[in-house]
Amino acid sequence: MISSNDFRTGTTIELDGAVWRVIEFLHVKPGKGSAFVRTKLKAVVSGNVVEKTFRAGEMVPQALLEKSKLQHTYMDGDDFVFMDMTSYEETRLTAKQIGESRKYLKEGMEVNVVSWNEKPLEVELPNSVVLEIKETDPGVKGDTASGGTKPAILETGAQVMVPLFISIGEKIRVDTRNDSYLGRETQ
């Protein structure tokens, strides 16, 4: 159980048999009456967003989520198949469960799969990934002086803005949280 006073962005709670993540919260102390906490909750499974108000200090069941490190092995139709590298058990997640993470997910990548009651819910990507540029406009000598950017399509199909001097075939590091270019990867 967790007190509504202890809510923070990212806290997971159980309501009506579902897992909800707090995406916004505001402690309100009106001049008259008791204090309350106004929250915006997002359903982890469906992605629905609702606003809910809790009394200050109200105890709410906290959803205990388990994270396990799994490797993305292959695609089976629209399903993403992950394997536990110690027990070799396979776990399947649908494209809906993967959500926006699919644009950075490539075979062989290790990710955290979040489960609740032994049911996989979502995938947590690393903060940055290294991917190869598959398509972009060619760089012209002297482009670095202007400091501009151009769109580039990565090996997973994601589109990222990169500096003008980046060319096809180069490996770059991308921030998965805000889709930004972090730098060239030299290996």
From Swiss-Prot:
InterPro entries: Elong-fact-P_C, NA-bd_OB-fold, Rib_uL2_dom2, Transl_elong_fac_P/YeiP, Transl_elong_KOW-like, Transl_elong_P/YeiP_cen, Transl_elong_P/YeiP_CS, Transl_elongation_fac_P. Pfam families: EFP, EFP_N, Elong-fact-P_C. GO terms for cellular component: cytoplasm. Signal peptide: none annotated. Pathway: Protein biosynthesis; polypeptide chain elongation. GO terms for molecular function: translation elongation factor activity. SUPFAM superfamilies: Nucleic acid-binding proteins, Translation proteins SH3-like domain. It is found in: Cytoplasm. The keyword Protein biosynthesis applies. One of its GO terms (biological process) is peptide biosynthetic process. Keywords: Cytoplasm, Elongation factor, Protein biosynthesis. It comes from the Bacteria. Involved in peptide bond synthesis. Stimulates efficient translation and peptide-bond synthesis on native or reconstituted 70S ribosomes in vitro. Probably functions indirectly by altering the affinity of the ribosome for aminoacyl-tRNA, thus increasing their reactivity as acceptors for peptidyl transferase. Belongs to the elongation factor P family. This is Elongation factor P. It comes from Prochlorococcus marinus (strain NATL2A).
